[in-house]
């Protein structure tokens, strides 16, 4: 096939064997089911209540039995042929002779939920119906085993327990609708059980001797109601498992799959135990990241007294079998610490285990978390008695800390003198210090940098002892430029009114003169091609282009007279998102939090590859995923779309996803760069964060992905970072991303940002989506606020990215 043929508005050309489509194929759906099972986490299993014994009769309680949430809303939504809920999954197991299901109860929930759907409700945003005593008694007569399912939904553009701020911000539009609906359904906030859910749970606990709980959620929720409850024997964190999530859950409940997932977050006793909760809703216009680097387990394992506030630690997850492990060797050579760990299945069932390596740096002058994840490995399936040796590697320089105030060496990563402990285990709390210590004899600078994206108005930050230190204040002076436009008017022009009509493939083949394909074929260099383009040509490249085919998130490129294709973009993190009106059903993959909970880079890479095949088959070139922001707070409405509270786990998972995607010569777009940890007023909220926390927590996962997977594109975020829109932040986009990390790809804005287009271009943000503002760039050029060289540089990066596309 000729290069870019799919971008020239051609009919879909199937990628499968014998002319079959891979989009939504049985093979991809099977992979989605398998991935879902790999990431579900068994939190509790008293008296081996799970797996359910063959032939057991079960009663399925809670609307979540049929009201299955496959994933979150917004860019993470996917159009699918079907969604398998838990009732349907358990009925399949019944057909296989493994369980018997009390249908009358499930049908009661099904009838109620279908009525709520007909009235406009969406999965997860429904009311728990009252459980009639008569039906409860019938269920108890049928069986002594109950399965309760609790489900939750959240989405792009609104936060959980979204409250009107105290500084004048008024919720409107979708934010207002979703927050009002959430408040109506979840009177205690959706972190906790509703009154109706709690009443149902209490009834079931009293009536049934065997109670199992399934949590169909996208992120952190309250766990204290089942953590120490003797009446509840087992709890499965099933997450939002994609289109086959209900069947994947049934696979685990019935023992066809042995759970091997591990938590990618810390589950505290109460919402208020997370340091971010205190100020998450303090203002709609800023968030002070005063907890600094002490996010998630870094807080709970370090700050005095915080450890006792944890219900389930980071990295925790049970299995149906037992494992023993022992360190068989530890050494350092050429700046890399290597630890060999032998894992043995000592139980009676086949299963997998995850070995986690943490390091503990000396407190020194900077202060450090007690433990930091440094490496991890998952075993293959081990049969009873089988063993496997895992090799975990930790580069010494990975243990360095960033000194933003000059306590050791200003604006540098440093290894402070002292002993660096190594811990091995299966979660952060149980990880034990091994008989190996790495010693740094004197303070050592591993990388000298310069101050970038530092705060102006963050007044204080947390230290390792739980106290706070004052931070220096400074004033921001904006670079001279055009008077700013009304930010609420920005984004109104539509690409369909600005973009040029594209060129179809046959016309492209017949075109004469210089063609962009000459660059791809090696007949001329990209620089030679750039010399032919006028300034107007370059400016036209810097904005989004019209949709074609089944795409709905617009394109990039599109200079028909030069044969530059209009390459399409598409959401999103849970699968290829195509509008229902197009009639294309794709595969809905498990949510990102579940994928991170697999702790399996190879599996995530397979998911990325399969998803990219669907993107490519539908003539789309850039997949707007993965989303890699940190789980700073459980209240962020988009956490389901992100991987973890830990930047190393998020970075390794994201890098695996990018490798899988780009193996198909489809561009991944890693987002949202950076510190986009709140959805309320997301286009105008300022993340005030220290440079150290920014570099060690909120940028580190992006750095790992850039250096290990080389993504074609990065998407800058809506929010401001220390007073400057991320899309206009030159220190971030050029100084850190390109100059320090060596990123050579394309930077795109998120869709319809509040940033000024010409300022974004100057900062290193190459294209404004979904629409550009060429007149504004021309005005800035004429008045000397942007140069032709800056414009051409971004245009060149756009064309260079298109050259990478198949």
Regions found by a protein language model. Give the residues of each.
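Short beta-strand elements
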Residues: 430-449
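Glycoside hydrolase catalytic-domain context in secreted enzymes
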Residues: 1-430, 451-806
């Amino acid at each position: 096939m000729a290069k870019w043929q799919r971008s020239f508005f051609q009919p879909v050309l199937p990628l499968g064997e014998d002319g079959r489509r891979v989009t939504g194929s049985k093979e991809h759906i099977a992979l989605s089911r398998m991935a879902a099972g790999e990431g579900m986490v068994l939190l509790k299993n008293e008296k081996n209540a799970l797996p359910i014994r063959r032939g057991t009769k079960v009663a399925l309680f809670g609307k979540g039995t049929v009201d299955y949430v496959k994933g979150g809303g917004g860019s993470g939504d996917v159009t699918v042929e079907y969604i398998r809920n838990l009732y349907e999954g358990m009925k399949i197991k019944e057909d296989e002779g493994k369980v018997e299901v009390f249908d009358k109860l499930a049908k009661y929930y099904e009838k109620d939920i279908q009525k709520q759907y007909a009235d406009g409700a969406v999965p997860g945003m429904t009311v728990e119906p009252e459980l009639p005593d008569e039906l409860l008694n019938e269920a108890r007569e049928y069986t002594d085993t109950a399965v309760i399912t609790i489900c939750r939904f959240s989405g792009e553009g609104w936060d959980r327990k979204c409250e009107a701020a105290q500084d004048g911000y008024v919720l409107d539009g979708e934010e207002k609708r979703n927050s009002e609906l959430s408040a109506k359904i979840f009177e205690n906030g959706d972190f906790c059980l509703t009154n109706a859910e709690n009443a149902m749970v209490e009834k079931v606990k009293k009536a049934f001797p065997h109670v199992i709980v399934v949590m169909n959620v996208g992120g952190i929720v309250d766990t204290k109601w089942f953590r120490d409850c003797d009446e509840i024997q087992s709890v499965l964190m099933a997450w939002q498992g994609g289109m086959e999530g209900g069947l994947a859950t049934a696979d685990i409940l019935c023992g066809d799959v042995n759970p091997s997932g591990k938590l990618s977050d810390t589950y505290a006793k109460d919402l208020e135990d997370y340091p971010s909760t205190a100020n998450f809703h303090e203002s709609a216009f800023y968030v002070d990241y005063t907890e600094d680097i002490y996010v998630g387990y870094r807080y709970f394992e370090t700050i005095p007294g915080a450890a006792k506030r944890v219900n389930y630690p980071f990295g925790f997850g049970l299995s149906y079998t037992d494992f023993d492990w022992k360190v068989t060797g530890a050494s350092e050579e050429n700046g890399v610490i290597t630890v060999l760990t032998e894992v043995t299945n000592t139980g009676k069932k086949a299963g997998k285990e995850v070995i986690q390596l943490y390091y503990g740096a000396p407190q020194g002058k900077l202060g450090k978390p007690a433990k930091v994840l440094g490496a991890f490995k998952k075993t293959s399936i081990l049969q009873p008695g089988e063993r496997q040796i895992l090799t975990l590697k930790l580069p010494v320089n990975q243990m360095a800390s960033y000194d933003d105030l000059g306590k050791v060496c200003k604006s540098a990563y440093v290894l402070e003198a002292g002993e660096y402990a190594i811990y091995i285990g299966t979660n952060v709390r149980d990880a034990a210090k091994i008989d190996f210590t790495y010693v740094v004899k004197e303070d050592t600078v591993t990388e000298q940098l310069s101050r970038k994206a530092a705060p102006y108005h963050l007044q204080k930050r947390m230290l390792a002892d739980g106290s706070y230190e004052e931070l220096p204040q400074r004033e921001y002076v904006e670079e001279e430029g055009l008077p700013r436009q009304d930010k609420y008017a920005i984004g109104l022009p539509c690409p369909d009114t600005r973009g040029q009509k594209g060129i179809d493939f046959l016309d492209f083949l017949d075109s004469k003169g210089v063609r962009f394909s000459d660059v791809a074929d090696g007949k001329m260099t990209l620089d030679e091609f750039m010399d032919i383009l006028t300034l107007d040509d370059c400016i036209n490249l810097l904005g989004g282009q019209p949709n074609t085919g089944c795409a709905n998130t617009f394109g990039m490129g599109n200079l028909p007279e030069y044969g530059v294709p209009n390459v399409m973009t598409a959401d999103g993190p849970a699968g290829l998102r195509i509008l229902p009106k197009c009639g294309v059903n794709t595969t809905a993959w498990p949510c990102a939090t579940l994928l991170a909970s697999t702790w399996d880079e190879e599996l995530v890479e397979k998911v990325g590859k399969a998803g990219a095949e669907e993107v490519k088959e539908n003539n789309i070139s850039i997949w707007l995923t993965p989303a890699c922001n940190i789980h700073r707070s459980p209240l962020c409405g988009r956490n389901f779309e992100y991987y973890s509270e830990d930047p190393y786990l998020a970075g390794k998972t994201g890098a695996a996803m990018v490798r899988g995607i780009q193996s198909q010569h489809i561009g991944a777009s890693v987002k949202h760069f950076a510190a986009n940890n709140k959805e309320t007023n997301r286009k105008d909220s300022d993340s005030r964060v220290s440079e150290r926390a920014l570099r060690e927590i909120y940028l580190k996962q992006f750095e790992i992905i850039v250096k290990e997977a080389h993504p074609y594109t990065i998407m800058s975020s809506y929010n401001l970072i220390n007073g400057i829109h991320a899309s206009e932040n030159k220190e971030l986009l050029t100084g850190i991303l390109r100059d320090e990390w060596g990123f050579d790809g394309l930077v795109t804005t998120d869709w319809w940002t509040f940033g000024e287009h010409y300022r974004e271009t100057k900062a290193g943000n190459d294209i404004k989506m979904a629409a550009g503002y060429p007149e504004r760039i021309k005005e800035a050029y004429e008045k000397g606020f942007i140069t032709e060289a800056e414009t051409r540089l971004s245009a060149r990066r756009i064309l260079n990215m298109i050259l990478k596309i198949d």
